[in-house]
Amino acid sequence: MNVAVQSRVDRETIGVARKTKAYVALTKPRVIELLLVTTAPVMILAQGGWPNPWLILGVLVGGTLSAGSANAFNCYIDRDIDRVMKRTQRRPLVTGELTDREALVFAWIIGVASIIWLGVISNWLAAALSLAAILFYVFVYTLWLKRRTPQNIVWGGAAGCMPVLIGWAAVTGDISWAPVILFMIVFLWTPPHYWPLSMKYRDDYASVNVPMLAVVRGRAAVGLQTILYSWATLACSLLLIPVAGMGLVYTLAALAGGGWFVYETHRLYDLAVRHEPIKPMRVFHASISYLSLLFLAVGIDPLLPF
């Protein structure tokens, strides 16, 4: 492993505002935003209309704490490789804005708080799913899969699918086929979302011996896999139509958004096999827009009379 030289801050000069900002950064808020995009629409679908606004707000708060805890544990565990990878050298455990102990205590506090909070404001099934998401992300993905297999993001990505189950369970108190399909949509979407990012930062991952698919197989193999998973995502999204009785808005969003996503993955692969310059982040950003559009339609469709 290469050793990067770090510029660590003097902890005695860190004020309250900067310390607070460091704690927020530890939770990876941009990742949390993407996770929460799926939660509220699923709650609307589960209710068949608007749930209690306070329930939506409460579940979003609980989901933020849960995901933040998992991400904070991840930062603590991966602090050794974060000090080497260029894209992670501004994280608070690398810069010294937070100590290892502060990060670990914080992760435990907000994790426990998320479980209790969700149990109290919704139900204990939602709380149990929150606990399962944290444990899976920390132990299965971060500690077991991430540094061992190129399929790390495939199976580890299951933790990022849990918000749809949590949102559904918070409203209905159970799990049916509709949330399972929604779970699978996010599960199948995750690899073609994340693998292009790993293509851009291939050298970063290689420098710390993390066997991302782009590191061990190359960009053509990544391009082909993104195609396969994007088609699977599109097909799975269409299954929701008969299962949940989705209407015209969702159907159009699934077809148009899914078709666009598939096109972008094909374009990435075509450029890769021709050894032409590629822009993997184009697929990365397209995947975010696609998922946001799809789940926006999930939330809008039950509110319409047609």
Curated annotation (Swiss-Prot):
Name of the protein: Protoheme IX farnesyltransferase
Transmembrane stretches, start-end: 31-50, 55-77, 104-124, 125-145, 168-188, 218-235, 238-258, 286-306
Subcellular location as annotated: Cell membrane
Gene Ontology CC annotations of this record: plasma membrane
UniProt KW Iron-sulfur keyword: no
UniProt gene name: ctaB
GO biological process: heme O biosynthetic process
One MF term in the entry's GO annotations: protoheme IX farnesyltransferase activity
Keyword Hydrolase tagged: no
Annotated EC: 2.5.1.141
Function in brief: Converts heme B (protoheme IX) to heme O by substitution of the vinyl group on carbon 2 of heme B porphyrin ring with a hydroxyethyl farnesyl side group.
Topology relative to the membrane: Multi-pass membrane protein
Alphabetical UniProt keywords: Cell membrane, Heme biosynthesis, Membrane, Transferase, Transmembrane, Transmembrane helix
